[in-house]
């Protein structure tokens, strides 16, 4: 088979199963409204949960820092790209989440890959929730360690896997809030089991940080859990982009030596780091608390209004509200029907989710109003699917 034939066959297979992904060009993609092709839609696909991507204080911080530092960092943090803005943000994050250290990464994907790749060796084992993010599972598959997956949120299965003999070290991997199902992991029980088997715990709290817990400290804080490795990302609750790993002093020093994504990547722009510090200040403030409370009320309003006889609504109380429709083509038709009525929603299909669980992944944000939720419910129930 030629290279071209391989490419063509893969694309043909995706088209045949209604799983071909595509991008949409938008004029505005974050916030209450999405604008595409000159039309305005209520936006139910954004990760900007607290509406901070449009916050004037954060925008101003980025602009002022860009004037001071320029638009790029100029190098890896190990060469010339670790500015006072980066250092300040790392200190603020560590103090906020009560960890000895925080290390910045250019993305959550990079952070997860870097940590797992740097830590795991040939005789080690990774035990990951089977619905863990692609960045975690890909890193685990690429590492020399053995990967075992436990049934989603099934702590008994996790315990059985950890009990089997392992010559090296074991790492338990889970998310705080799951990106496709919107539910939360039983973190306290998972941590208890991990410690009983002398395993370390890595929690990716991309969808919880900033949005849940006291001062937005996330799912782990809310559950009274402190994993050895906490990954937080900044493209959701923070409204910007990037990520950080919270850990001990020695692990931070280790990652600075062996995390290749950190050593060999140009660091995020200093202006971005300063904008993230401004975002953190909003998240920790009374305004941040009010934004979280409003979002929680909108989620409750949506869940109370969904017709459960027509849609499978998962046990998700986060900003992520998936409606399971099962069939790929039905999910695509439903998403298109919503767009025709002015509501932008995304159909999620395999391989992102398991076969037979195609869904509308609806995300609610603080930027929405109660009338927006009511309109979404009206359109959903009249979609004819």
Swiss-Prot record:
It holds the Pfam family Aminotran_1_2. Transmembrane segments: none annotated. Keywords: Biotin biosynthesis, Pyridoxal phosphate, Transferase. One of its GO terms (biological process) is biotin biosynthetic process. Gene3D superfamilies: Aspartate Aminotransferase, domain 1 (3.90.1150.10), Type I PLP-dependent aspartate aminotransferase-like (Major domain) (3.40.640.10). Pathway: Cofactor biosynthesis; biotin biosynthesis. Its EC number is 2.3.1.47. It catalyses: 6-carboxyhexanoyl-[ACP] + L-alanine + H(+) = (8S)-8-amino-7-oxononanoate + holo-[ACP] + CO2. The keyword Transferase applies. Its cofactor is pyridoxal 5'-phosphate. Homodimer. Catalyzes the decarboxylative condensation of pimeloyl-[acyl-carrier protein] and L-alanine to produce 8-amino-7-oxononanoate (AON), [acyl-carrier protein], and carbon dioxide. This is 8-amino-7-oxononanoate synthase. The lineage of its organism: Bacteria, Pseudomonadati, Pseudomonadota, Gammaproteobacteria, Enterobacterales.
């Amino acid at each position: 088979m030629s290279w071209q034939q391989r490419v063509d066959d893969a694309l043909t297979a995706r088209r045949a199963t209604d799983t071909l992904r595509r991008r949409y060009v938008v004029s505005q993609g974050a916030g209450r409204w999405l604008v595409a092709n000159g039309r305005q839609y209520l936006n139910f696909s954004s990760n900007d949960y607290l509406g901070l991507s449009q916050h004037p204080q954060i925008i101003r911080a980025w602009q002022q820092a860009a004037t001071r530092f320029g638009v790029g960092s100029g190098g890896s943090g190990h060469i010339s790209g670790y500015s006072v803005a980066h250092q300040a943000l790392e200190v603020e994050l560590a103090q906020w989440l009560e960890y000895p250290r925080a290390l910045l990464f250019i993305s959550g994907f990079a952070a997860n890959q870097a940590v797992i790749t740097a830590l795991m060796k040939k005789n080690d084992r990774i035990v990951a929730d089977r619905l863990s993010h692609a960045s975690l599972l890909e890193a685990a598959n690429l590492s020399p360690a053995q990967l075992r997956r436990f049934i989603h949120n099934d702590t008994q299965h996790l315990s059985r896997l950890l009990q089997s003999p392992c010559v090296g070290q074991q790492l338990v991997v889970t998310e705080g809030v799951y990106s496709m199902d919107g539910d939360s992991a039983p973190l306290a029980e998972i941590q208890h089991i991990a410690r009983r088997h002398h395993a370390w715990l890595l929690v990716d709290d991309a969808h919880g940080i900033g949005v849940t817990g006291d001062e937005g400290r996330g799912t782990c804080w809310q559950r009274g859990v402190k994993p050895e490795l906490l990954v937080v990302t900044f493209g959701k609750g923070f409204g910007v982009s990037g990520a950080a790993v919270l850990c001990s002093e020695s692990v931070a020093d280790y990652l600075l030596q062996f995390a290749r994504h950190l050593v060999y990547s140009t660091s995020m722009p200093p202006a971005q780091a300063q904008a993230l510090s401004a975002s953190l200040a909003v998240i920790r403030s009374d305004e941040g608390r009010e934004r979280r409370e409003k979002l929680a009320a909108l989620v409750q309003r949506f869940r109370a209004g969904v017709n459960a006889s027509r849609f499978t609504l998962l046990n998700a109380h986060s900003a992520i509200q998936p409606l399971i429709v099962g069939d790929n083509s039905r999910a695509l038709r439903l998403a298109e029907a919503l767009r025709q009525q002015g509501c932008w929603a995304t159909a999620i299909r395999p391989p992102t989710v398991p076969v037979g669980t195609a869904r509308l992944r609806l995300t609610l944000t603080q930027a929405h109003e109660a009338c927006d939720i009511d309109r979404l419910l009206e359109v959903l129930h009249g979609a004819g699917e």
